[in-house]
Amino acid sequence: MAGAKEIRSKIASVQNTQKITKAMEMVAASKMRKSQDRMAASRPYAETMRKVIGHLAHGNLEYKHPYLEERDVKRVGYLVVSTDRGLCGGLNINLFKKLLAEMKTWTDKGVQCDLAMIGSKGVSFFNSVGGNVVAQVTGMGDNPSLSELIGPVKVMLQAYDEGRLDKLYIVSNKFINTMSQVPTISQLLPLPASDDDDLKHKSWDYLYEPDPKALLDTLLRRYVESQVYQGVVENLASEQAARMVAMKAATDNGGSLIKELQLVYNKARQASITQELTEIVSGAAAV
């Protein structure tokens, strides 16, 4: 059994670590609330944009935009949103596992996959497993802007425009609540039709002014950008929630470990006192 002094040192070490994890839990909780506010502010725009685009997919368009047309799939692209920092439980690895499983279904069909990474954890992971990373952006902090994200988005849209990509997806964690974040893979291009049953039984006609091509070019690009930005802010809220939960679990585990060490310390101290008493009694008996 370890000595009492060594056990006291371990208890002090765990207590110091517990203070750190508790502070990180509180910081993550504060950042999560701010991230939730940003997510709530951007979600109505993203959802309305998705609804408008869903109307277009069901509409009788006088100009058929390339983003609305299905192609034979030879290469697909993924915009992957991960975190820049760790200590957020299984948030990243669960997302990566889901993506790897989907990529395998494509590669089994002879389809190649390109990856545009947002977040350093995704960059390091997919470089280590041999993924074809064609664009990346990292270090966006806790308040990302669209201008910081636009690089990888432009790379993938250009590849799609030039016919080098036939499908484009966004991969990110969807924030459900503090305890639940769901890894999701959503198709961006070609434009997915809305799931709204009412739309499937209606014919949508639009009048474009001044020019349908110019309007759709701008609108559909803005749609992709809005979905990517929404994915990033939701992933950020998911990151802070996962980190808060992970740090709370670490703090609670530290408390349990301290109790166990305190029990061991008490036993060691009791054994030491018993030994000293035995030695005193033995010495007195010898006299």
Curated annotation (Swiss-Prot):
What Pfam families does the database record attribute to this sequence?
Answer: ATP-synt
Keyword Zinc belongs to the record = no
Return one GO MF term: ATP binding
Tell where it localizes.
Answer: Cell inner membrane
Q: What does this protein do?
A: Produces ATP from ADP in the presence of a proton gradient across the membrane. The gamma chain is believed to be important in regulating ATPase activity and the flow of protons through the CF(0) complex.
Member of which family? Belongs to the ATPase gamma chain family.
- The protein's gene is named atpG
Q: Which NCBIfam families match?
A: ATPsyn_F1gamma, PRK05621.1-1
Looking up CDD domains in the UniProt record yields: F1-ATPase_gamma
Its main localization is membrane
* A single GO BP: proton motive force-driven plasma membrane ATP synthesis
The UniProt keywords, alphabetically, are: ATP synthesis, Cell inner membrane, Cell membrane, CF(1), Hydrogen ion transport, Ion transport, Membrane, Transport
Q: What HAMAP family would the database entry show?
A: ATP_synth_gamma_bact (MF_00815)
The protein here is known as ATP synthase gamma chain
Question: Entry's InterPro entries?
Answer: ATP_synth_F1_ATPase_gsu, ATP_synth_F1_gsu, ATP_synth_F1_gsu_CS
Q: Which GO terms describe its cellular component?
A: plasma membrane; proton-transporting ATP synthase complex
Q: What's the source species for this entry? A: Escherichia coli O139:H28 (strain E24377A / ETEC)
